[in-house]
């Protein structure tokens, strides 16, 4: 296998983390909204936890993107 093809395959596999981050963010917001509809008084208390979960899930996706870009352009 050529080096260029291996780089493309590796970057594609590393980019799968972006799909995982998208699914995770969807689950986080979906669960927050269902909980907020059940108990609106607790929604304001849970909002900081929502933002923390969103940031952690997004950071995971961004790390995967950085790894994919490093594989493509640094090696």
From Swiss-Prot:
The record marks 58 as: Reversibly protonated during proton transport. Keywords: ATP synthesis, Cell inner membrane, Cell membrane, CF(0), Hydrogen ion transport, Ion transport, Lipid-binding, Membrane, Transmembrane, Transmembrane helix, Transport. The keyword Transport applies. It is a multi-pass membrane protein. The chain crosses the membrane at residues 9-29, 54-74. Pfam families: ATP-synt_C. SUPFAM superfamilies: F1F0 ATP synthase subunit C. It is found in: Cell inner membrane. Its main location: membrane. Coiled coil: none annotated. GO terms for molecular function: lipid binding; proton-transporting ATP synthase activity, rotational mechanism. One of its GO terms (cellular component) is proton-transporting ATP synthase complex. The keyword Ubl conjugation does not apply. F(1)F(0) ATP synthase produces ATP from ADP in the presence of a proton or sodium gradient. F-type ATPases consist of two structural domains, F(1) containing the extramembraneous catalytic core and F(0) containing the membrane proton channel, linked together by a central stalk and a peripheral stalk. During catalysis, ATP synthesis in the catalytic domain of F(1) is coupled via a rotary mechanism of the central stalk subunits to proton translocation. F-type ATPases have 2 components, F(1) - the catalytic core - and F(0) - the membrane proton channel. F(1) has five subunits: alpha(3), beta(3), gamma(1), delta(1), epsilon(1). F(0) has three main subunits: a(1), b(2) and c(10-14). The alpha and beta chains form an alternating ring which encloses part of the gamma chain. F(1) is attached to F(0) by a central stalk formed by the gamma and epsilon chains, while a peripheral stalk is formed by the delta and b chains. NCBIfam families: PRK07558.1. Belongs to the ATPase C chain family. This is ATP synthase subunit c. It comes from Pelagibacter ubique (strain HTCC1062). The gene is atpE.
